[in-house]
Amino acid sequence: MNAKHFTQVNMETLDAVACLASELGVVPSDFSYAGIKDKKAVTSQTMVVKDVTINRLKAIQSSIQNKDLKIYNLRPATRHLQIGQLKGNHFSIIIRNVSKCLEDDPEASLTERVFDAIEKIKEKGFVNYYGPQRFGLGQNVQTDQIGLALLKQNLVKALHLFFTPEEGNDAVNKAKRHFIHTEDAKATLALMPEYKTRERLVLRALNRYGNGHEGCTRAWLSLPHNMRILYIHSYCSKIWNEAASFRLKTYGMNVVEGDLVSCDRLEQDDSSQNNHVHVVTAKDVESSTYSIDQVVLPMPGYSVRYPCNKLSSWYQEALVQDGLEMSRFRIPALQLNVPGCYRALLARPHELVYRWLGGEEVLCAKEDFAIGESKLLPKTGGALSLSFSLNSSSYATVCLREIMKCSV
Protein backbone atom coordinates (compact mmCIF):
# COMPACT_ATOMS: atom_id res chain seq x y z
CA MET A 1 0.00 0.00 0.00
CA ASN A 2 1.06 3.55 -0.64
CA ALA A 3 -0.16 6.86 0.77
CA LYS A 4 -0.34 10.16 -1.04
CA HIS A 5 -1.51 13.69 -0.53
CA PHE A 6 -4.12 14.58 -3.04
CA THR A 7 -5.57 17.90 -4.26
CA GLN A 8 -8.80 18.22 -6.23
CA VAL A 9 -10.50 21.26 -7.76
CA ASN A 10 -14.30 21.50 -8.23
CA MET A 11 -14.66 17.73 -8.04
CA GLU A 12 -16.34 15.38 -5.58
CA THR A 13 -14.01 13.04 -3.70
CA LEU A 14 -15.85 9.98 -5.01
CA ASP A 15 -15.55 11.15 -8.62
CA ALA A 16 -11.86 11.92 -8.07
CA VAL A 17 -11.31 8.41 -6.69
CA ALA A 18 -13.06 6.93 -9.72
CA CYS A 19 -10.81 8.97 -12.02
CA LEU A 20 -7.66 7.83 -10.21
CA ALA A 21 -8.85 4.22 -10.21
CA SER A 22 -9.40 4.37 -13.97
CA GLU A 23 -5.93 5.84 -14.57
CA LEU A 24 -4.29 3.18 -12.38
CA GLY A 25 -6.36 0.23 -13.61
CA VAL A 26 -7.73 -0.59 -10.15
CA VAL A 27 -11.21 -0.37 -8.59
CA PRO A 28 -12.44 2.51 -6.39
CA SER A 29 -12.70 0.21 -3.37
CA ASP A 30 -8.88 -0.10 -3.42
CA PHE A 31 -8.73 3.48 -2.11
CA SER A 32 -9.29 4.49 1.49
CA TYR A 33 -9.58 7.97 2.98
CA ALA A 34 -10.78 9.68 6.14
CA GLY A 35 -13.54 11.89 4.75
CA ILE A 36 -15.46 13.32 1.81
CA LYS A 37 -14.35 16.80 0.73
CA ASP A 38 -16.57 19.53 -0.70
CA LYS A 39 -16.83 19.85 -4.47
CA LYS A 40 -16.94 23.65 -4.61
CA ALA A 41 -13.43 24.18 -3.25
CA VAL A 42 -9.76 23.45 -3.72
CA THR A 43 -9.25 20.61 -1.24
CA SER A 44 -6.35 18.45 -0.09
CA GLN A 45 -6.40 15.17 1.80
CA THR A 46 -4.44 11.98 2.40
CA MET A 47 -5.44 8.75 0.66
CA VAL A 48 -4.17 5.20 0.73
CA VAL A 49 -4.34 2.89 -2.29
CA LYS A 50 -3.45 -0.79 -2.11
CA ASP A 51 -1.37 -2.83 -4.54
CA VAL A 52 -0.05 0.22 -6.39
CA THR A 53 3.62 1.18 -6.42
CA ILE A 54 4.93 4.71 -5.98
CA ASN A 55 6.35 4.57 -9.52
CA ARG A 56 2.88 3.84 -10.93
CA LEU A 57 1.50 6.83 -9.05
CA LYS A 58 4.28 9.04 -10.37
CA ALA A 59 3.53 7.86 -13.90
CA ILE A 60 -0.01 9.26 -13.87
CA GLN A 61 0.84 12.65 -12.36
CA SER A 62 0.98 14.51 -15.67
CA SER A 63 -2.19 12.95 -17.12
CA ILE A 64 -4.38 13.65 -14.08
CA GLN A 65 -3.17 17.25 -13.77
CA ASN A 66 -5.27 18.02 -16.86
CA LYS A 67 -8.29 16.75 -14.90
CA ASP A 68 -7.83 19.19 -12.00
CA LEU A 69 -6.18 16.56 -9.79
CA LYS A 70 -2.72 16.56 -8.23
CA ILE A 71 -0.94 13.94 -6.15
CA TYR A 72 2.17 14.54 -4.09
CA ASN A 73 4.01 13.47 -0.90
CA LEU A 74 4.02 9.84 -2.02
CA ARG A 75 5.12 7.36 0.64
CA PRO A 76 4.57 3.73 1.70
CA ALA A 77 1.66 2.95 4.03
CA THR A 78 1.09 -0.01 6.34
CA ARG A 79 -2.67 0.26 6.85
CA HIS A 80 -5.88 1.55 5.33
CA LEU A 81 -7.60 4.77 6.39
CA GLN A 82 -11.10 4.69 7.87
CA ILE A 83 -13.93 7.20 7.37
CA GLY A 84 -13.83 9.57 10.34
CA GLN A 85 -10.17 8.86 11.09
CA LEU A 86 -9.17 12.52 11.32
CA LYS A 87 -9.31 15.28 13.91
CA GLY A 88 -10.77 17.86 11.59
CA ASN A 89 -10.24 20.17 8.66
CA HIS A 90 -8.45 23.48 8.19
CA PHE A 91 -9.99 26.18 6.01
CA SER A 92 -8.53 29.25 4.31
CA ILE A 93 -11.25 31.49 2.91
CA ILE A 94 -11.55 34.95 1.36
CA ILE A 95 -14.96 36.63 1.42
CA ARG A 96 -15.15 39.40 -1.16
CA ASN A 97 -17.46 42.40 -1.52
CA VAL A 98 -18.34 42.50 2.18
CA SER A 99 -20.97 45.11 3.04
CA LYS A 100 -23.22 45.97 5.98
CA CYS A 101 -26.76 44.70 6.31
CA LEU A 102 -29.54 47.28 6.39
CA GLU A 103 -30.45 46.36 9.96
CA ASP A 104 -26.89 46.85 11.24
CA ASP A 105 -26.08 49.60 13.73
CA PRO A 106 -25.47 52.67 11.51
CA GLU A 107 -22.94 53.97 14.03
CA ALA A 108 -20.75 50.85 13.80
CA SER A 109 -18.12 50.66 11.09
CA LEU A 110 -18.05 47.71 8.72
CA THR A 111 -14.80 46.49 10.27
CA GLU A 112 -16.28 46.67 13.78
CA ARG A 113 -19.40 44.82 12.70
CA VAL A 114 -17.45 42.04 11.00
CA PHE A 115 -14.94 41.56 13.81
CA ASP A 116 -17.69 41.58 16.44
CA ALA A 117 -19.55 38.81 14.59
CA ILE A 118 -16.39 36.71 14.37
CA GLU A 119 -15.55 37.17 18.05
CA LYS A 120 -19.06 36.08 19.04
CA ILE A 121 -18.64 32.86 17.08
CA LYS A 122 -15.21 32.36 18.64
CA GLU A 123 -16.66 32.82 22.13
CA LYS A 124 -20.03 31.05 21.87
CA GLY A 125 -19.65 28.72 18.91
CA PHE A 126 -22.44 27.93 16.47
CA VAL A 127 -25.12 25.28 16.04
CA ASN A 128 -23.40 22.27 14.52
CA TYR A 129 -25.84 21.83 11.64
CA TYR A 130 -24.94 19.71 8.66
CA GLY A 131 -24.26 22.04 5.75
CA PRO A 132 -26.27 22.20 2.51
CA GLN A 133 -23.64 20.23 0.63
CA ARG A 134 -24.60 17.19 2.74
CA PHE A 135 -27.91 17.12 0.87
CA GLY A 136 -26.74 17.82 -2.67
CA LEU A 137 -27.35 20.79 -4.91
CA GLY A 138 -30.51 19.49 -6.56
CA GLN A 139 -33.70 21.54 -6.52
CA ASN A 140 -36.09 18.77 -7.57
CA VAL A 141 -34.59 15.93 -5.53
CA GLN A 142 -32.09 16.01 -2.69
CA THR A 143 -30.00 13.13 -1.44
CA ASP A 144 -31.95 12.74 1.82
CA GLN A 145 -35.04 11.80 -0.22
CA ILE A 146 -33.06 9.05 -1.93
CA GLY A 147 -31.77 7.92 1.47
CA LEU A 148 -35.30 7.68 2.86
CA ALA A 149 -36.42 5.55 -0.09
CA LEU A 150 -33.43 3.25 0.47
CA LEU A 151 -34.21 2.95 4.19
CA LYS A 152 -37.77 1.96 3.27
CA GLN A 153 -36.17 -0.57 0.89
CA ASN A 154 -38.00 0.91 -2.08
CA LEU A 155 -35.02 0.52 -4.36
CA VAL A 156 -36.90 1.18 -7.61
CA LYS A 157 -38.26 4.50 -6.31
CA ALA A 158 -34.80 5.43 -5.00
CA LEU A 159 -33.36 4.83 -8.46
CA HIS A 160 -35.97 7.01 -10.13
CA LEU A 161 -35.21 9.76 -7.62
CA PHE A 162 -31.50 9.28 -8.38
CA PHE A 163 -32.16 9.94 -12.08
CA THR A 164 -34.66 12.77 -11.63
CA PRO A 165 -33.35 15.65 -13.79
CA GLU A 166 -33.03 19.29 -12.84
CA GLU A 167 -34.04 22.19 -15.06
CA GLY A 168 -31.75 22.82 -18.00
CA ASN A 169 -30.62 21.11 -21.17
CA ASP A 170 -27.03 20.25 -20.30
CA ALA A 171 -25.81 16.78 -21.22
CA VAL A 172 -26.34 15.29 -17.76
CA ASN A 173 -29.95 16.44 -17.45
CA LYS A 174 -30.72 15.40 -21.02
CA ALA A 175 -29.44 11.91 -20.23
CA LYS A 176 -31.42 11.71 -16.98
CA ARG A 177 -34.56 12.95 -18.71
CA HIS A 178 -34.13 10.29 -21.39
CA PHE A 179 -33.91 7.55 -18.76
CA ILE A 180 -36.99 8.76 -16.86
CA HIS A 181 -39.00 8.84 -20.10
CA THR A 182 -37.72 5.59 -21.64
CA GLU A 183 -36.02 3.52 -18.90
CA ASP A 184 -33.54 2.59 -21.63
CA ALA A 185 -30.31 2.15 -19.69
CA LYS A 186 -28.18 1.38 -22.75
CA ALA A 187 -29.21 4.51 -24.65
CA THR A 188 -28.91 6.64 -21.52
CA LEU A 189 -25.40 5.31 -20.91
CA ALA A 190 -24.40 6.53 -24.37
CA LEU A 191 -25.72 10.00 -23.49
CA MET A 192 -24.29 10.26 -19.98
CA PRO A 193 -20.95 12.16 -19.80
CA GLU A 194 -17.90 10.11 -18.85
CA TYR A 195 -17.23 12.12 -15.69
CA LYS A 196 -20.58 11.15 -14.11
CA THR A 197 -19.10 8.11 -12.43
CA ARG A 198 -22.00 7.11 -10.21
CA GLU A 199 -24.63 7.42 -12.90
CA ARG A 200 -22.59 5.38 -15.36
CA LEU A 201 -21.95 2.59 -12.85
CA VAL A 202 -25.68 2.34 -12.16
CA LEU A 203 -26.61 2.43 -15.84
CA ARG A 204 -24.16 -0.34 -16.69
CA ALA A 205 -25.72 -2.55 -14.02
CA LEU A 206 -29.26 -1.76 -15.20
CA ASN A 207 -28.28 -2.52 -18.79
CA ARG A 208 -26.98 -5.91 -17.67
CA TYR A 209 -29.60 -6.93 -15.10
CA GLY A 210 -32.75 -5.02 -16.08
CA ASN A 211 -34.90 -2.37 -14.41
CA GLY A 212 -36.86 -4.60 -12.02
CA HIS A 213 -36.29 -5.00 -8.29
CA GLU A 214 -33.37 -7.39 -8.80
CA GLY A 215 -31.79 -5.13 -11.40
CA CYS A 216 -32.18 -2.08 -9.17
CA THR A 217 -30.64 -3.96 -6.25
CA ARG A 218 -27.62 -4.88 -8.36
CA ALA A 219 -27.45 -1.32 -9.67
CA TRP A 220 -27.19 0.09 -6.14
CA LEU A 221 -24.64 -2.59 -5.24
CA SER A 222 -22.54 -1.51 -8.22
CA LEU A 223 -21.72 1.66 -6.26
CA PRO A 224 -18.91 1.43 -3.69
CA HIS A 225 -20.10 1.14 -0.09
CA ASN A 226 -18.99 4.71 0.70
CA MET A 227 -21.23 6.00 -2.07
CA ARG A 228 -24.27 3.95 -1.03
CA ILE A 229 -24.07 4.89 2.63
CA LEU A 230 -23.88 8.61 1.82
CA TYR A 231 -27.57 8.66 0.90
CA ILE A 232 -28.57 7.06 4.20
CA HIS A 233 -26.35 9.46 6.13
CA SER A 234 -27.93 12.36 4.26
CA TYR A 235 -31.39 11.39 5.52
CA CYS A 236 -30.09 10.89 9.07
CA SER A 237 -28.39 14.30 8.86
CA LYS A 238 -31.69 15.94 7.90
CA ILE A 239 -33.33 14.41 10.98
CA TRP A 240 -30.41 15.58 13.16
CA ASN A 241 -30.69 19.16 11.85
CA GLU A 242 -34.41 19.24 12.57
CA ALA A 243 -33.85 17.73 16.02
CA ALA A 244 -31.25 20.39 16.81
CA SER A 245 -33.68 23.15 15.86
CA PHE A 246 -36.41 21.59 18.02
CA ARG A 247 -33.98 21.17 20.93
CA LEU A 248 -32.95 24.83 20.85
CA LYS A 249 -36.50 26.09 20.38
CA THR A 250 -37.72 23.97 23.32
CA TYR A 251 -34.88 24.30 25.82
CA GLY A 252 -32.63 27.05 24.51
CA MET A 253 -28.97 26.98 25.57
CA ASN A 254 -29.69 25.36 28.94
CA VAL A 255 -28.69 21.82 29.89
CA VAL A 256 -31.92 20.11 30.98
CA GLU A 257 -32.91 16.83 32.57
CA GLY A 258 -32.97 14.03 30.02
CA ASP A 259 -30.35 15.57 27.75
CA LEU A 260 -27.54 13.37 26.49
CA VAL A 261 -24.02 14.59 27.24
CA SER A 262 -20.76 13.17 25.99
CA CYS A 263 -18.27 11.92 28.52
CA ASP A 264 -15.68 11.54 25.76
CA ARG A 265 -14.22 14.02 23.31
CA LEU A 266 -16.27 14.06 20.13
CA GLU A 267 -13.67 14.52 17.40
CA GLN A 268 -15.29 12.22 14.92
CA ASP A 269 -18.75 11.91 13.48
CA ASP A 270 -19.96 8.88 11.61
CA SER A 271 -17.43 6.55 13.30
CA SER A 272 -18.27 7.71 16.81
CA GLN A 273 -21.07 5.25 17.53
CA ASN A 274 -19.51 4.05 20.76
CA ASN A 275 -18.92 7.33 22.54
CA HIS A 276 -20.02 7.05 26.15
CA VAL A 277 -23.08 9.21 26.76
CA HIS A 278 -24.76 10.07 30.04
CA VAL A 279 -28.41 10.99 30.60
CA VAL A 280 -28.55 14.25 32.55
CA THR A 281 -30.35 13.95 35.89
CA ALA A 282 -32.16 16.58 37.95
CA LYS A 283 -29.20 16.53 40.35
CA ASP A 284 -26.82 17.22 37.44
CA VAL A 285 -28.91 20.23 36.44
CA GLU A 286 -29.04 21.54 40.00
CA SER A 287 -25.27 21.30 40.40
CA SER A 288 -24.50 22.56 36.86
CA THR A 289 -22.37 19.48 36.27
CA TYR A 290 -22.46 19.76 32.49
CA SER A 291 -22.27 22.61 29.98
CA ILE A 292 -24.12 23.09 26.71
CA ASP A 293 -20.86 22.27 24.90
CA GLN A 294 -21.18 18.68 26.14
CA VAL A 295 -24.75 18.16 24.91
CA VAL A 296 -25.02 15.72 22.02
CA LEU A 297 -27.89 14.60 19.83
CA PRO A 298 -28.09 11.15 18.25
CA MET A 299 -27.96 10.49 14.56
CA PRO A 300 -30.70 7.87 14.07
CA GLY A 301 -29.57 4.26 13.99
CA TYR A 302 -30.21 0.88 15.53
CA SER A 303 -27.81 1.17 18.48
CA VAL A 304 -28.01 4.76 19.76
CA ARG A 305 -29.74 6.06 22.87
CA TYR A 306 -32.26 8.85 22.56
CA PRO A 307 -32.74 11.75 25.00
CA CYS A 308 -35.16 11.20 27.88
CA ASN A 309 -37.16 14.40 27.46
CA LYS A 310 -39.41 15.92 24.79
CA LEU A 311 -36.81 15.07 22.17
CA SER A 312 -37.52 11.35 22.60
CA SER A 313 -41.09 11.67 21.34
CA TRP A 314 -39.94 14.15 18.69
CA TYR A 315 -37.53 11.59 17.18
CA GLN A 316 -40.17 8.87 17.28
CA GLU A 317 -42.81 11.04 15.63
CA ALA A 318 -40.39 12.25 12.95
CA LEU A 319 -39.38 8.72 11.98
CA VAL A 320 -42.94 7.39 12.09
CA GLN A 321 -44.06 10.28 9.89
CA ASP A 322 -41.46 9.17 7.34
CA GLY A 323 -42.64 5.56 7.56
CA LEU A 324 -39.75 4.27 9.66
CA GLU A 325 -39.51 2.63 13.04
CA MET A 326 -36.60 3.30 15.39
CA SER A 327 -34.91 -0.02 14.62
CA ARG A 328 -35.14 -0.07 10.83
CA PHE A 329 -31.64 1.02 9.97
CA ARG A 330 -30.39 -2.17 8.35
CA ILE A 331 -30.69 -2.87 4.63
CA PRO A 332 -29.41 -6.43 4.08
CA ALA A 333 -30.01 -6.32 0.32
CA LEU A 334 -27.59 -3.40 0.00
CA GLN A 335 -25.18 -4.57 2.72
CA LEU A 336 -25.85 -1.38 4.69
CA ASN A 337 -26.02 -1.16 8.48
CA VAL A 338 -26.52 2.16 10.24
CA PRO A 339 -25.83 1.92 13.98
CA GLY A 340 -26.08 5.69 14.44
CA CYS A 341 -23.75 8.02 16.30
CA TYR A 342 -23.69 11.13 18.47
CA ARG A 343 -22.98 14.66 17.32
CA ALA A 344 -22.22 17.70 19.45
CA LEU A 345 -25.00 20.29 19.43
CA LEU A 346 -22.50 23.15 19.20
CA ALA A 347 -19.23 23.55 17.31
CA ARG A 348 -16.42 26.05 17.78
CA PRO A 349 -13.74 27.17 15.35
CA HIS A 350 -10.19 26.96 16.65
CA GLU A 351 -6.88 28.32 15.36
CA LEU A 352 -9.04 31.21 14.16
CA VAL A 353 -7.16 34.01 12.40
CA TYR A 354 -8.86 36.80 10.49
CA ARG A 355 -7.74 39.91 8.68
CA TRP A 356 -9.59 42.73 6.97
CA LEU A 357 -8.09 43.25 3.52
CA GLY A 358 -9.79 46.60 3.03
CA GLY A 359 -8.34 48.56 0.12
CA GLU A 360 -5.79 45.95 -0.87
CA GLU A 361 -6.02 43.84 -3.94
CA VAL A 362 -7.43 40.42 -3.18
CA LEU A 363 -5.90 37.10 -4.12
CA CYS A 364 -8.16 35.28 -6.54
CA ALA A 365 -7.90 31.51 -6.39
CA LYS A 366 -7.00 29.75 -9.61
CA GLU A 367 -7.52 26.07 -10.21
CA ASP A 368 -4.02 25.39 -8.88
CA PHE A 369 -4.09 27.96 -6.07
CA ALA A 370 -3.62 25.22 -3.46
CA ILE A 371 -0.03 24.66 -4.48
CA GLY A 372 0.98 28.27 -4.45
CA GLU A 373 -0.10 29.80 -7.75
CA SER A 374 -2.41 32.80 -7.69
CA LYS A 375 -3.32 35.94 -9.52
CA LEU A 376 -4.44 39.38 -8.39
CA LEU A 377 -8.00 40.50 -8.78
CA PRO A 378 -8.71 44.23 -8.56
CA LYS A 379 -10.71 45.10 -5.49
CA THR A 380 -14.45 45.72 -6.05
CA GLY A 381 -15.42 45.82 -2.36
CA GLY A 382 -14.19 45.07 1.13
CA ALA A 383 -12.70 41.62 1.63
CA LEU A 384 -12.16 39.45 4.67
CA SER A 385 -9.51 36.77 5.01
CA LEU A 386 -10.37 33.94 7.42
CA SER A 387 -8.54 30.80 8.41
CA PHE A 388 -9.71 28.34 11.05
CA SER A 389 -10.00 24.68 11.92
CA LEU A 390 -13.14 22.68 12.70
CA ASN A 391 -13.59 19.23 14.14
CA SER A 392 -14.41 16.43 11.75
CA SER A 393 -17.77 16.79 9.99
CA SER A 394 -18.39 20.36 11.13
CA TYR A 395 -19.13 22.65 8.22
CA ALA A 396 -17.31 25.85 7.32
CA THR A 397 -20.37 26.96 5.33
CA VAL A 398 -22.48 26.80 8.51
CA CYS A 399 -19.87 28.75 10.47
CA LEU A 400 -19.72 31.40 7.74
CA ARG A 401 -23.50 31.58 7.53
CA GLU A 402 -23.63 32.38 11.24
CA ILE A 403 -20.98 35.09 10.86
CA MET A 404 -22.54 36.62 7.75
CA LYS A 405 -26.19 36.07 8.73
CA CYS A 406 -27.00 34.94 5.21
CA SER A 407 -26.77 31.87 2.99
CA VAL A 408 -23.32 30.93 1.76
Short names for language-model regions:
Residues 1-408:
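Non-catalytic, substrate/partner-engaging modules appended to enzymatic cores
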